Amino acid sequence: MFDTITGIVKNTRDSSSVDALIEALGDILDGSPQGGEISDADAKRIQTEIDKFDQIEYEPNTMRKALQMMILKVSKADQLQANYQLTPDTIGDVVSYIASGLLENRQSLSILDPAMGTGNLLTTVINGLTNNINVEAHPYGLENDDAMFEIAASSFELQQVQADLYHEDAITDVMVPKVDLIVSDLPIGYYPIDENVANFETKAEKGHSFVHHLFLEMAANHLADGGVGIFLVPSAIFKSDEAKSLLKWMQGKVYLQGLLNLPKDLFANEAAQKSILILQKVGGDAKQAEPVMLGEFPSFKDAKGVQNFLTEIDEWRKNNMSK
């Protein structure tokens, strides 16, 4: 259905695939084709697809996965840049599993993704929290890219998830309340507007600053005392020349509770490898875990090995982390 309507719009408008998808999602949510310059025959075809959609009640996760496949298709067709890449479900499921364990005694919580992209990681974690610990989660999302924000907003609406979404740069001042949980597949690279980061402790002494360092600082500022942040970061985050300022900033503000390398076979090369970074905001009942959880996931193809590793994480959490 997504594919059919997107194809009709793309051919009619001679637009990019991602723009066609955005218009198609708008048509589905509006219940009829809204754009002009569509022939009666094409409008009828679109309406037929929308009517089929309206007659079926989809599970939110089914809807998310269908949209995920469509995003992958249009990203490939348009050869979109790396920041359009979706966080794989296997990683999203691991993040939600860890979050569920750390917050298992909560009945409700607030969750933020300050770099939500198309919203796939955030909705994956929300679904996981609901299924794993039956918690009521209220999501907040920030995204600066126009196209990704439009897709994310449509995705949440199609999944019938009530969320507060903001189309803005997370590094500038944002009107998001402090939350209990932050999850994010952080952008990697340099932040281009130096004057926006003048008050950041993690800014570079000279030149542009690492954007993932800035996002960690921003995230900590939006965590409630004792709140948890789970981030996808470069595995070498603490080995760069700029790591000294990051570690200095962390002292007294957040506890480094875990750093778990994702399987090497997920990435093109060692330099591209990512890890799951677990931070906890100082305050409340939070305390430094002893020891910090360090390790590397086995290949996700090794189901038994992954389950054993998750069991190790559970044991570490029960013995070392406050809830």
Predicted regions and their residues:
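Flexible, glycine-/basic-rich loop-and-beta segments that form/coincide
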Residues: 272-323
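Conserved S-adenosyl-L-methionine
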Residues: 88-184, 189, 235
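Mobile active-site "lid"/loop adjacent to the S-adenosyl-L-methionine
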Residues: 185-215, 236
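Class I SAM-dependent methyltransferase Rossmann-like catalytic core
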Residues: 77-90
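Phosphate/oxyanion-binding active-site loops and adjacent basic polyanion-contact surfaces
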Residues: 87-92, 208-212
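Conserved Class I SAM-dependent methyltransferase catalytic core
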Residues: 208-265
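A short N-terminal interaction module
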Residues: 1-76
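Short glycine/serine/proline-enriched coil/turn segments at secondary-structure junctions
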Residues: 238-239, 267-270, 286
